[in-house]
Amino acid sequence: GVETHVIEFAPMLMDEQLDQMGGEQLRRKIESMGVKVHTSKNTKEIVQQGTEARKTMHFADGSELQVDFIVFSTGIRPRDKLATQCGLAVAQRGGIMVNDSCQTSDPDIYAIGECASWNNRVYGLVAPGYKMAQVAVDHLLGSENSFTGADLSAKLKLLGVDVGGIGDAHGRTPGARSYVYLDESKEVYKRLIVSADNKTLLGAVLVGDTSDYGNLLQLVLNAIELPENPDSLILPAHAGSGKPSIGVDKLPDSAQICSCFDVSKGDLIAAINKGCHTVAALK
C-alpha cells in the first residue's frame, strides 16, 4: 500500500474552522486511518533525490521527509497584476483593495470575488463573490447596499471524517462562553460558543458528527434566541429531553437557504406563490 503523509504549515489542521481541541480530534481520527500528519511545517525546498525515495522535502525546522509523489493543495492567490500595472491600490498580502461598495481606489472601477481584498481579506469561496456582485450591481444602480463580510461556515467530509465549523469557532468574541460535548468512544467532539447572556449562538465546532450543522447554522445566521439550556442542541437524545430544532416557520424571510446562489426563505416562498410546487420547479 501507499504510505500517506499530510504536511500542514499551520499548527493544526483546519485552523480557520476548528478550535484546538477540534483540530486535535480531527488529527487523531485521520492518524487512526494510517495517515501521518505533520503540522507547523514550512517547506524550504524539494530536492529531486533521496536515499529511500525519489524526492526529499526539507523543512525550515531542519527536519526532512523523503517521498515519491507530492500533491499540492495551496488554496487561491488573487490575480492582481493588471490592477498593479494600472496603479490601483493592492493589499499587502495581495488582492485589489475595495471598500464596502466593492469600489477600488478608482471609484469608477469595481472588483469582486477572489481578486478583491476587503479589509485585507481575500475570500476564496463562491458565496462571498456572489454577495460582492450583488453589492456592486446595487451601487451601480444607485441602491444602498454594502458588503460587510461573509459567513465562512463550512461542512465537509475530510478523509471520511465529518467536520463542521460555524461563525466564531475560536470563541474570540469578548465575554463568549462555551458548551462542550466529547464522546471519546465514538470520537465525536462538539462545541457551542454563546454570548455572555447565554441567548445568542456565536459559533460552533463539530468533529465526527455534523448532524446538528444545519440547525446551528440557522441559529447563528439569523440570531435566533437560544433555548433555556443551549447544551441540549448538541447533546445526544439519550442524555435527556428531545433535541430542540428550528422550524421553518421560525426563520425570517431573509434566512439564507442556499449559500451558493444566495437563495433566501423569502425567495422560495415567492416562487411557491407563483406556482412552483415541486423541487424541480424551485430549482
Where in this protein do the model-derived segments appear?
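Rossmann-like dinucleotide-binding cores of NAD(P)H-dependent redox enzymes
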Residues: 2-45, 129, 147-163
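Residues forming the flavin
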Residues: 4, 10-12, 16, 52-53, ...
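Short acidic-glycine loop/turn motifs at beta-strand connectors
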Residues: 49-50, 99, 195-200
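FAD-site-proximal beta/loop scaffold in flavoenzymes
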Residues: 50, 56-58, 63-138, 225-240
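Mid-to-C-terminal Rossmann-like scaffold of FAD/NAD(P)H-dependent oxidoreductases
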Residues: 115-214, 239-270, 276
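A short, polar/charged loop-to-alpha-helix boundary motif
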Residues: 209-228
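LysM (lysin motif) carbohydrate-binding repeats in extracellular/periplasmic proteins that recognize
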Residues: 273-283
